[in-house]
């Protein structure tokens, strides 16, 4: 089994080659040609291969072990790939430099809608990406239930730059396991709608909730889906109006689109990448060292004991929207080659080896 789950039995090029070899001089009927096009497109979007199930993946991880050695060469190669495909240093967020007045951009999650940068949106962007690059030691914290009773909070807080996903709870009951430090926190517009009623009725609950993130950047995909633009702008104006410590950054749709294409070319086929994979991808392009926590999308832990889906609840995601096992296998591969470190064991039992 490939460690990344990338083996395919069919590809569009391979299928074309077979047709050309079997029928070198035959012209297919119009209906048959159209059917071939449909089949080849389907195979490209949904390649035929069997992904290992949860039990097989967990057993594979247990067999390989989690001991780790940093490989600066592997990390450097992957950082260069990120720079070449997606340019996170310049395109991670919307800025006055990459989104000037009058520029038209397409929503990355929709095919039919574009938007033009006008004065009202341009004024919300920073001049440039507001980080001192490269960032040194970064921690990307997912929300997996494997973090519960992990004791990883102290280790997470030792990072120079901490990224978190989807406005997670950081109250005192969780800090021992997930830490309290944050520098960048993502917020999907769907969360603003579900938890805070799109900020249409009361803003106080939202403002109070945000205080736990201190001086963090709040990273929002305002221009990913058209329905997400208005809630994202409300978040910006709400925090600005009350003089909150947080600063809103809007994801550049060109960056999100490029990250999606990058991982699709490596075998991840889903309606949408998870927020966690977007963040890890950005970190690999922005940071010298990357450690990830809570990236374990399975129902049992490393001892094959049942765990909750998140460290704070057991609410399951919508089925089929993300390809979490495929994403995990890609990240596990990066861990095994030393490009990043994936923390799966309790932190007090951490087994690290020197840099190579």
From Swiss-Prot:
Alphabetical list of InterPro entries matching this protein: Glyco_trans_29, Glycosyltr_29_Sialyltrsf, GT29-like_sf, Sialyl_trans
Glycosylation sites: 71, 119, 214, 245
Keyword vocabulary terms for this entry: Disulfide bond, Glycoprotein, Glycosyltransferase, Golgi apparatus, Lipid biosynthesis, Lipid metabolism, Membrane, Signal-anchor, Sphingolipid metabolism, Transferase, Transmembrane, Transmembrane helix
One cellular component term from this protein's GO annotations in UniProt: Golgi membrane
Cytoplasmic face residues: 1-29
Similarity comment: Belongs to the glycosyltransferase 29 family.
Transmembrane segments: 30-48
Domain of life where this protein originates: Eukaryota
Pathway as given in its UniProt record: Protein modification; protein glycosylation; Lipid metabolism; sphingolipid metabolism
Reactions catalysed: an N-acetyl-alpha-neuraminyl-(2->3)-beta-D-galactosyl derivative + CMP-N-acetyl-beta-neuraminate = an N-acetyl-alpha-neuraminyl-(2->8)-N-acetyl-alpha-neuraminyl-(2->3)-beta-D-galactosyl derivative + CMP + H(+); a ganglioside GM3 (d18:1(4E)) + CMP-N-acetyl-beta-neuraminate = a ganglioside GD3 (d18:1(4E)) + CMP + H(+); a ganglioside GD3 (d18:1(4E)) + CMP-N-acetyl-beta-neuraminate = a ganglioside GT3 (d18:1(4E)) + CMP + H(+); a ganglioside GD1a (d18:1(4E)) + CMP-N-acetyl-beta-neuraminate = a ganglioside GT1a (d18:1(4E)) + CMP + H(+)
CDD domains: GT29_ST8SIA1 (cd23989)
Gene Ontology terms: biological process: N-glycan processing; oligosaccharide metabolic process; protein glycosylation; sphingolipid metabolic process
Name this polypeptide is given: Alpha-N-acetylneuraminide alpha-2,8-sialyltransferase
Keyword Transferase: yes
Binding locations of CMP-N-acetyl-beta-neuraminate: 143, 166, 274-276, 296, 310
Keyword Protein biosynthesis: no
One Gene Ontology MF term: alpha-N-acetylneuraminate alpha-2,8-sialyltransferase activity
Pfam families in the record: Glyco_transf_29
Lumenal compartment segments: 49-356
Enzyme nomenclature, EC number: 2.4.3.8
UniProt topology in membrane: Single-pass type II membrane protein
Subcellular location(s) per record: Golgi apparatus membrane
